[in-house]
């Protein structure tokens, strides 16, 4: 028996929507990263984009456990000498783009490389309750009911 390799035409991508209101960021990001990679499917192939499309709504209403909301620090560098910039999840969630907290968490849970960048493109995060993907008829995932620790 030969090893099965998925072909491009055999990929079945589904659409899922997750309401992030009251959910813990790290647990949500780990779950979403698994769905984006397609590791929950029996036909998972590492070199193919066989993951699903994920829509996350209410991204500004996520929670952190412990003191991470005020004490966790996100770093980025401008590329110039002395250009190290710091921010906290509190500043990001109260800022102009609160959905970046979830995007940063999921992106850092994916591997590096061109395939991860392609998979990350299948993630759509919205800060409010509305999204523009009703035409795809996404299935709702109740992530909070999967484990009591998922919701705070």
UniProtKB/Swiss-Prot annotation:
GO molecular function: mRNA binding; structural constituent of ribosome
Annotated stretches, region: Disordered: 128-152
Annotated Gene Ontology cellular component terms: cytosolic large ribosomal subunit
Superkingdom as given in the UniProt entry: Bacteria
Swiss-Prot/TrEMBL GO biological process terms: negative regulation of translation; translation
Sorted UniProt keywords: Ribonucleoprotein, Ribosomal protein
Function: This protein is one of the early assembly proteins of the 50S ribosomal subunit, although it is not seen to bind rRNA by itself. It is important during the early stages of 50S assembly.
Assembly: Part of the 50S ribosomal subunit.
Family, as annotated: Belongs to the universal ribosomal protein uL13 family.
Listed name of the protein: Large ribosomal subunit protein uL13
Taxonomic source organism: Wolbachia sp. subsp. Brugia malayi (strain TRS)
Encoding gene per record: rplM
